[in-house]
Curated annotation (Swiss-Prot):
Name of this protein: Aspartate carbamoyltransferase catalytic subunit
Keywords: Pyrimidine biosynthesis, Transferase
Catalysis performed (reactions): carbamoyl phosphate + L-aspartate = N-carbamoyl-L-aspartate + phosphate + H(+)
The enzyme's E.C. designation: 2.1.3.2
HAMAP family cross-referenced by the UniProt entry: Asp_carb_tr
A Pfam family hit: OTCace
GO BP annotations, alphabetical order: 'de novo' pyrimidine nucleobase biosynthetic process; 'de novo' UMP biosynthetic process; amino acid metabolic process
Length: 307
C-alpha cells in the first residue's frame, strides 16, 4: 500500500483540503502516472453529472474511471427528470438510493454541493467538477501536479495568474492553495474583471511588469458566458493588452512554464503558435488530469470502504 493513499469523504473545495491531503493527492497522481494499479473487484458505481459543457474535466474523469475499473452509470441531463423540474438535490437523492457510490458533478450554482454533503439521507460521495465561478478542485490539483513535476516544490515560486479572474473558479481554487503552499502570487488582467478578494492572496500587476520574473505564467480563458454584458475588449485589443504575444513569451525566464486550464481562445489569451511552444505545459496538464482524478476517486472510495 502506498503511503500516499488516503480516505476523503468528499472532494468539493480546495479550502476543505489540508496541505498534507493535497500533497498526497499530487504524489498519488504521479504514482498512477508511473503505472500504479488499483483494480476494484467490488465494482463501485460512479455517475458523472455535467450541467455545464465540458470536454477535459468530463472525459478525463471518464478515462480515470475506466483505468480504475469502475462501473459508470451514464447520466444525460437532457433526457433526465431535470427537464421536468426535478431539483439537483432530488436527482442526487435518487442516485444515492439506487446505490451509486460517487457522483461527479458540474453545476452552474456556486456551492451547490453544500446541501448535498450536509444531507443525512444522501450517502453517495460528491466530487465537485466545478461550481459556477466558485471552485474547481480537480483542475487545481492537476495544475499543482504539473507544477510539482516541473519544480519539485512550491515554496518561493512566483506564480502569475492572468485573465478573467472574477469569473474563474480555477483562479480562486489555485490562489487559495498556492498561498498555503508558500508560493508568491501575482494577478494580471483587466481591472473590470478582478475583485478585492484577490488582494488577500497576492499583488495586482500588469502582465508586462511581471512576465520576466515568474516561474509559472498561468493564463485564464475569457468566460464570455459568465459576463452580464457584451465583450469589453475586441479579441485583438485583449490579446495586445493582456495576452501572451511572441514578445512576451521571449521575455519569460528560461526555466519558466506556461499554463492554461483550457479551453483556449487562441490568439486571445495565447497566440495560436505558442499554445504548444517549448515552455508550454498545457498538454501535460490535460494528461495529468486523468491521473490526479484517479487519485481523487481512489481517496473517496477508500473513505466509503472504511465506513
Amino acid at each position: 500500500m502506498s503511503e500516499n493513499q488516503q480516505a476523503l469523504n468528499h472532494v468539493v473545495s480546495m479550502e476543505d483540503l489540508t496541505v498534507d491531503q493535497v500533497m498526497k493527492l499530487i504524489k498519488r497522481g504521479i504514482e498512477f502516472k508511473n503505472g500504479a494499479q488499483l483494480p476494484y473487484e467490488d465494482h463501485p458505481i460512479v455517475s458523472n453529472l455535467f450541467f455545464e459543457d465540458s470536454t477535459r474535466t468530463h472525459k478525463s474523469f471518464e478515462v480515470a474511471e475506466i483505468k480504475l475499473g469502475l462501473e459508470r452509470l451514464d447520466f444525460d441531463v437532457k433526457t433526465s427528470s431535470v427537464n421536468k423540474g426535478e431539483t439537483l438535490y432530488d436527482t442526487i437523492l435518487t442516485l444515492s438510493a439506487l446505490g451509486v457510490d460517487v457522483c461527479v458533478i458540474r453545476h452552474p450554482e456556486v456551492d451547490y454541493y453544500r446541501e448535498l454533503i450536509a444531507s443525512p439521507t444522501i450517502t453517495t460521495s460528491i466530487i465537485n467538477g466545478g461550481d459556477g465561478s466558485g471552485q474547481h478542485p480537480s483542475q487545481s490539483l492537476l495544475d499543482l501536479m504539473t507544477i510539482y513535476e516541473e519544480f519539485g516544490h512550491f515554496e518561493g515560486l512566483k506564480v502569475a495568474i492572468a485573465g478573467d479572474l472574477d469569473h474563474s473558479r480555477v483562479a480562486k481554487s489555485n490562489m487559495q492553495i498556492l498561498k498555503r503552499l508558500g508560493s508568491e502570487l501575482f494577478f494580471a488582467g483587466p481591472e473590470e474583471w478582478r475583485s478585492q478578494e484577490f488582494a488577500d492572496y497576492g499583488q495586482f500587476v500588469t502582465i508586462d511588469e511581471i512576465i520576466d520574473q515568474v516561474d509559472v505564467m498561468m493564463f485564464l480563458r475569457v468566460q464570455h458566458e459568465r459576463h452580464d454584458s457584451g465583450a469589453v475588449f475586441s479579441k485583438e485589443d485583449y490579446h495586445a493588452q493582456h495576452g501572451l504575444t511572441q514578445e512576451r513569451y521571449d521575455r519569460l525566464k528560461e526555466t519558466a512554464i506556461l499554463m492554461h486550464p483550457a479551453p483556449i481562445n487562441r490568439d486571445v489569451e495565447i497566440a495560436d503558435h505558442l499554445v504548444e511552444a517549448p515552455k508550454s505545459r498545457i498538454v501535460q496538464q490535460m494528461t495529468n488530469g486523468v491521473f490526479v482524478r484517479m487519485a481523487i476517486l481512489e481517496s473517496v472510495l477508500a473513505s466509503r470502504n472504511a465506513n
